[in-house]
């Protein structure tokens, strides 16, 4: 019995010692864990090198082909009045010491009161207001550059080269009275005759007094042939005869004048449609081009005229006359923006050589030339 008690006591002592050892081991483990956690908290985070975001590649600078000196001079002289109008007003705005939000608002007013059409005006204004940063808006150079770029975009109407390889190439010329239609035909005849073309004019405006005589005078000056009809006669028959003559006698171009009553005259539209049908009977596919002559001095009314004609007729080109005598030359922008019809020629003076193929780059450069923007209106 005594031995059993002794063994029990020894077992209890051993058990107590084991518990003490385990307790100490547990305390050491907790202490170590706390120390490790503390070290982790106090350990400075690794510095991760963050590379600055790469700046987006700058947009390629627009390459604008400069016109030759002679062309630039002609455009500059012909656009003097327009440059002295709304462009000069813009020049005064951007000439301020500080360009601010109020200046941009004034630009909107200038554009919308210019004869460039509301669509083109809004397109240019939004390109400046929304297309430039706040910093850029403080730079007159950046504003001018944006105005020029947007104007070039507006004028970038698809304009395939005139294909005169068809023999004869038949050109139908439209326009209301007084826009310079007959004079334009005479100048075109002179220009193409100088290129060695065999030209035949067609006096298809049989209703206007002296229209045939005027075209006949141009035929003499250009030394080209003409087909005439009877006064008040059927324009379609005159044009039919002319095209047949052009085919039979191997002419290069047949240029057809047409009646030019007011664009609101429904009877005129019917007559012009008949002319087109008859032309196609005389030569399949004729007319190959139909150009409309507009007077720049009429401003936005020119756009209205063209819209009315275009609603009933296929217009493939515009000739804009009298730019040199008008402050409304910016109407070219409205014509291209709203009609999507290419401007083929512009009139920059009275001489035959002043009727020039339209060069959008030369037009924009000489119209929005900062050096000339302060010219007197």
What is the predicted function of each stretch?
Residues 119-122, 148-377:
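P-loop/Walker A NTP-binding module and the surrounding RecA-like catalytic core of P-loop NTPases
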Residues 1-153, 166-167, 194, 373-377:
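Non-catalytic terminal/linker segments enriched in charged/polar, low-complexity residues
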């Amino acid at each position: 019995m005594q031995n059993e008690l002794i063994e029990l006591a020894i077992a209890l002592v051993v058990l107590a010692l084991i518990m003490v050892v385990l307790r100490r081991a547990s305390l050491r483990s907790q202490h170590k864990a706390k120390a490790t956690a503390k070290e982790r908290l106090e350990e400075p985070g690794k510095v991760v090198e963050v590379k600055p975001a790469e700046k987006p590649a700058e947009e390629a600078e627009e390459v604008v082909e400069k016109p030759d000196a002679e062309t630039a001079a002609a455009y500059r002289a012909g656009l003097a009045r327009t440059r002295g109008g709304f462009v000069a007003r813009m020049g005064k705005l951007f000439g301020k010491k500080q360009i601010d939000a109020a200046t941009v608002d004034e630009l909107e007013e200038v554009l919308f009161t210019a004869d460039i059409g509301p669509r083109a005006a809004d397109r240019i204004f939004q390109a400046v207001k929304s297309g430039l940063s706040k910093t850029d808006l403080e730079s007159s150079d950046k504003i001018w550059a944006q105005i020029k770029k947007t104007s070039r975009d507006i004028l970038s109407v698809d304009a395939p080269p005139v294909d005169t390889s068809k023999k004869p190439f038949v050109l139908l010329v439209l326009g209301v009275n007084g826009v310079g239609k007959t004079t334009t035909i005479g100048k075109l005849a002179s220009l193409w005759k100088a290129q060695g073309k065999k030209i035949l004019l067609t006096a298809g405006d049989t209703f206007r007094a002296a229209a045939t005589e005027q075209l006949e005078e141009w035929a003499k000056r250009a030394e080209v042939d003409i087909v005439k009809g009877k006064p008040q006669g059927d324009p379609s028959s005159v044009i039919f005869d002319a095209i047949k003559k052009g085919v039979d006698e191997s002419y290069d171009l047949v240029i057809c004048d047409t009646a030019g009553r007011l664009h609101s005259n429904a009877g005129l539209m019917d007559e012009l449609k008949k002319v087109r049908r008859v032309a196609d009977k005389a030569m399949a596919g004729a007319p190959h081009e139909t150009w409309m002559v507009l007077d720049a001095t009429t401003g936005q009314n020119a756009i209205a005229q063209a819209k009315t004609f275009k609603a009933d007729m296929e217009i493939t080109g515009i000739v804009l006359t009298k730019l040199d005598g008008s402050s409304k030359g910016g109407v070219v922008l409205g014509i291209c923006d709203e009609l999507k019809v290419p401007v083929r020629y512009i009139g920059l003076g009275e001489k035959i050589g002043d009727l020039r193929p339209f060069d959008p780059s030369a037009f924009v450069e000489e119209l929005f030339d900062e050096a000339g923007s302060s010219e007197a209106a």
